[in-house]
Swiss-Prot record:
Homology family: Belongs to the SurE nucleotidase family.
EC number, as in UniProt: 3.1.3.5
GO function terms (MF aspect): 3'-nucleotidase activity; 5'-nucleotidase activity; exopolyphosphatase activity; metal ion binding; nucleotide binding
Keyword Hydrolase found: yes
Principal cellular location given in the protein's record: cytoplasm
Cofactor note: Binds 1 divalent metal cation per subunit.
Keyword terms of this UniProt record: Cytoplasm, Hydrolase, Metal-binding, Nucleotide-binding
GO (cellular component) term, any one: cytoplasm
The protein, known as: 5'-nucleotidase SurE
Required cofactor names: a divalent metal cation
Length: 252
């Protein structure tokens, strides 16, 4: 397949380069990624500034470009200008840290994959759990991403699908399997700590602790139980459960 590879951690991040090195052995890969760290960019795009595109050399045989914009910009620029006609799949990652539960809404990694689907290109986001002061398991995540890709044929891929793949932090032997599941609730209970600086301004810092109230059968639940999770996503945000009720409430 012809793969467009992007991320939100930046073009020099270990995750995307580990994945690129493995995928390029079996597929044609073009890397288009932010020049700098752009985590938690969500689906933001660059409007008021020009976007700078630079070709980057990589040690493996792929084309690579850095983009001065956001993860979503990377996909837009790639599919509009750099490789507009021959991409079979967009893969975003490997992200440093999970993208499960409500965190999906903030994720530049997932949003880049969603942007691919909005261009009618099947897409997958790949994220690996990160534990502070421990070495990331990108090679395990890359193997699972390649395995998912190899199970798919071009004719199997719906052009508006986004697959969200997350890999827990543990040895490969400890992984219990793969669960296809729904999105869970929040991972963390977040809050702002407050300090006062020398000029009397409030200085707020985001902090939090792990949310222990999780729902069984969700990505958050299975990751905590050492399963790889795969969740199909879609960019249509319509709440169909109350669509008719809303019509009756406001238009009847």
């Amino acid at each position: 397949m012809n793969i467009l590879l992007t991320n939100d951690d930046g073009i020099e991040a270990e995750g995307i380069n580990t994945l690129a090195e493995l995928l390029s052995k079996y597929h044609d890969v073009t890397m288009v990624a932010p020049e700098n760290q752009r985590s938690a960019s969500s689906h933001s795009i660059t409007i008021y500034e020009p976007i700078i595109v630079k070709q980057v050399k990589k040690p493996y045989n792929i084309e690579a470009y850095s983009i001065s914009g956001t993860p979503a910009d990377c996909v837009r620029v790639a599919l509009d200008k750099l490789v507009p006609d021959n991409i079979d799949m967009v893969i975003s990652g490997i992200n440093k840290g999970l993208n499960i539960g409500n965190d999906i809404l903030y994720s530049g990694t997932v949003s880049a994959a969603i942007e691919g689907a909005m261009y009618k290109v099947p897409s997958m986001a790949v994220s690996a759990q990160f534990i502070k002061n421990k070495k990331e398991n990108y090679k395990i995540a890359a193997k699972y991403a390649l395995g998912m890709l190899n199970r798919l044929k071009k004719e199997d891929l719906k052009n508006d699908v986004v697959l969200n793949l997350n890999i827990p932090f543990c040895s490969e032997e400890e992984i219990k399997g793969i669960k296809v599941c729904k999105v869970g609730n929040k991972i963390f209970n977040t809050r702002f700590s407050e300090e006062i600086d020398e000029e009397g301004n409030k200085v707020l810092k985001l902090e939090g602790d792990i949310n222990k109230d999780i729902y069984e059968g969700t990505d958050v639940y299975y990751i905590r139980n050492k399963y790889v999770t795969l969740t199909p996503l879609h960019y249509d945000l319509t709440n169909f459960n109350i669509l008719e009720e809303t019509e009756q409430l406001f238009l009847s």
